[in-house]
Amino acid sequence: MSHSVSLTFPDGSVREFAAGTTGRDVAESISKSLAKKAVAIALDGELRDLSDPIADGKIEIVTREDKRALELIRHDAAHVMAEAVQELWPGTQVTIGPVIDNGFYYDFAKNEPFTPDDLPVIEKKMKEIIARNNPFSKEVWSRDKAKEVFAAKGESYKVELVDAIPEGQDLKIYYQGDWFDLCRGPHMASTGQIGTAFKLMKVAGAYWRGDSNNPMLTRIYGTAWHTQEELDQYLHVLAEAEKRDHRRLGREMDLFHFQEEGPGVVFWHGKGWRVFQSLVAYMRRRLEVDYQEVNAPQVLDKSLWETSGHWGWYRDNMFKVTVAGDETDDDRVFALKPMNCPGHIQIFKHGLKSYRELPVRMAEFGAVHRYEPSGALHGLMRVRGFTQDDAHIFCTDEQMAAECLKINDLILSVYEDFGFKEIVVKLSTRPDKRVGSDALWDRAEAVMTDVLNTIEAQSEGRIKTGILPGEGAFYGPKFEYTLKDAIGREWQCGTTQVDFNLPERFGAFYIDKDSEKRQPVMIHRAICGSMERFLGILLENYAGHMPLWISPLQVVVATITSDADDYGREVAARLREAGLTVETDFRNEKINYKIREHSVTKVPVIVVCGKREAEERSVNIRRLGSQAQTAMSLEEAVAALSSEAMAPDLKRKMERSARAA
């Protein structure tokens, strides 16, 4: 028996449609032009094919310009790429091809792997297929039919995928012209709606199902966008990112390296360690008034990690430690700490705490180790051993809001000192699986929502805020701080997390004003997150042109002739006395050669001394990236460079002292 379908539109209006009505029918009932522009529908927020019969719910007609259409554009482009490959190289097997961040890929089984030279050929064929504007259509097949058809085509990987689909689940087959593939969908109306704003990016190897015991396939990555302008912008950012790649800069600037014997751990060179220590020193100064710096052990018995819960839910990411020698009675299992928090709770618990002592703020530049798959490692950005600028605040419920605001002020101030102006702060709320009562979460989320509103109001709109529903940790809600770099990329760095779990697990308490035991609120706080990763972000943000105060090498004194070497030594000594890191270059080379060489290693200031400068007791200053030279007296140069090389927090301190004098 037929019945009507009730649809609610974005403007709140409700209309009835006959059963069996499709999304395309609904679009046509509004206007022919809308139906022509439509690529899909969203029913209760879920994207569906235009050809799907509708059911009761909230409906939106999705056009190609809609942000949500980008996923469909990329999905359809992946299918067209697969069709192009099989047209060009018959017998090639198509395996899987998902949409990923900024693009898509497909894995292929081919006797001779693809090379980068094949990509333009595939792109040309893709444009031909798109120009055909074949409609996408969907069929539902039985498991047996799907296996029979794919087996007949020699698609053994597709047969395996069909076998993996649970019994009773529909097998959807999408056609574009005569070509078809197994796919969950949805797709747009036709291949022509993909457009031509796409590019195939690279070829890589990939094991079938990610298992090294399986055959190696060839993966082709691509990207697709709404418009050519968006594609061009994306490619520009990629080119900029490649120029700014911190791994390349690390080599050029002689900062660090990695090697096979220590996967995911950094070998810091002298200059790199200098800038790392400058960052630590800066962070340490920012904490010296409000925090006590502590140090928890690197290696702890697994029983502590069992109590914390890490051994149960994080063990696969932990490094287990046992005694190497056979001649020992100690058979206990230890682990390198992946996090500092359990150690800090032990320090808090050591001795009775009164409510009068709260908040207790502990900070540690703690070396932690976490296992990451080798394929996930990426320079300083993704490592196995790193340093956290970690802090934990133990406070009362009533102090939580003030502490979160205090943390926020510190985080924003630090980011501003490093030149990051565009910051987004988002509150992640309770997930489905969590510890703690609803009342506890209600209280924490209410407090943190008020804090979020205060952050936005105090910044007068400069700081953007938002909510991430259900994205909180299982132990409490959290703030996430995301900063935007010089080429528009976003980096999530800082966090403020409220924890109801660990204090309870470890039995941490303080004595309240009524002499009763109370569980403290524990707030986890990180600003840089990983110090190594933050340095990688800084290197890429500045393209190696680091601010003078955090530069690994601040000045090179280079002489034009040997007659100026003695004066050059005096200049270098004066600059070192003023606190700058200085090297000299008195080689018998032309000055332009020296300048070019030091520019490659991103030395921010080259102080040039010749015979005339020695006689006049002056210098010429050459800045990285500039052809101009600035002449000034030695005294002026020392004063100017020492002032510029002073860290922002020390400048503020000096200015406050001057005002108070």
Curated annotation (Swiss-Prot):
Pfam families: HGTP_anticodon, TGS, tRNA-synt_2b, tRNA_SAD. Its main location: cytoplasm. It is found in: Cytoplasm. GO terms for molecular function: ATP binding; metal ion binding; threonine-tRNA ligase activity; tRNA binding. The keyword Zinc applies. It is an enzyme of class 6 (ligase). Residues 245-547 are annotated as: Catalytic. Its cofactor is Zn(2+). Keywords: Aminoacyl-tRNA synthetase, ATP-binding, Cytoplasm, Ligase, Metal-binding, Nucleotide-binding, Protein biosynthesis, RNA-binding, tRNA-binding, Zinc. Zn(2+) binds at residues 341, 392, 524. Transmembrane segments: none annotated. Its EC number is 6.1.1.3. It catalyses: tRNA(Thr) + L-threonine + ATP = L-threonyl-tRNA(Thr) + AMP + diphosphate + H(+). Residues 1-64 form the TGS domain. GO terms for biological process: threonyl-tRNA aminoacylation. Disulfide bonds: none annotated. SUPFAM superfamilies: Class II aaRS ABD-related (SSF52954), Class II aaRS and biotin synthetases (SSF55681), TGS-like (SSF81271), ThrRS/AlaRS common domain (SSF55186). Catalyzes the attachment of threonine to tRNA(Thr) in a two-step reaction: L-threonine is first activated by ATP to form Thr-AMP and then transferred to the acceptor end of tRNA(Thr). Also edits incorrectly charged L-seryl-tRNA(Thr). NCBIfam families: thrS. This is Threonine--tRNA ligase. It comes from Sinorhizobium fredii (strain NBRC 101917 / NGR234).
